[in-house]
Amino acid sequence: MIDKTAIINSKAKLEKNVQVGPYCVIGPNVEIGENTIIQSHVNISGNVKIGKGNKIYPFVSINDPQDLKYAGEPTNLIIGDNNKIREYVTINPGTVGGGGKTVIGDKCLFMISSHIAHDCQVGSNVIIANNVPLGGHAIIEDNVVIGGNSAVQQFTRIGKMAMIGGMTGVLHDVIPYGLSTGNRNSLQGLNLIGLRRAKFENKDILGLSLSLIHI
């Protein structure tokens, strides 16, 4: 269902069962996969490809990179399947200098007012809590959790299944499976809760713990 107040460019491509709510604006080079729901007041422009089964909440803005060097070049944003993008989230396509592409995987949750900057690479099953900005070129691997009001510096890499505590300033890379907290983040150990939730065996957790000693 397409609301009568939505403005959708005739060149946009919407697959079957896409829903677009009131007062949305969708540009000409946008592709939206089937069964995706776009609620009210959402703006999507640029070369954007959105997969299947996503849910995009009110006042989300997907628009040009926030980079002074960006001069309107055709760059890309690719979003996978079954993601939840909550209110006031902002997502930017890539820049020419950063490879020209921002990529988001599948089954992620982006909570209210989080920001995915240009050229970020976000894996699958990632949870980014409220008010978390990712700086440009950040790499967030699969199954990462980032606590609320944290900030991730540009060019930072967070390894798979790592957890970032709330209100953490991430200035350095974080190892896979690590737990990092602090105003200037420091490694506190393994993300034991996440490992147990993922049903890692005790012997594997022990092996990771022993490896951590040598870092």
Question: Language-model segments: what does each one mean?
Answer:
Residues 2-186:
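Structural signal for interior beta-strand "rungs" in well-ordered beta-sheet cores
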Residues 175, 182-205:
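ABC transporter nucleotide-binding domain
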Residues 213-215:
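Conserved small/polar residues in nucleotide/adenosyl-binding loops
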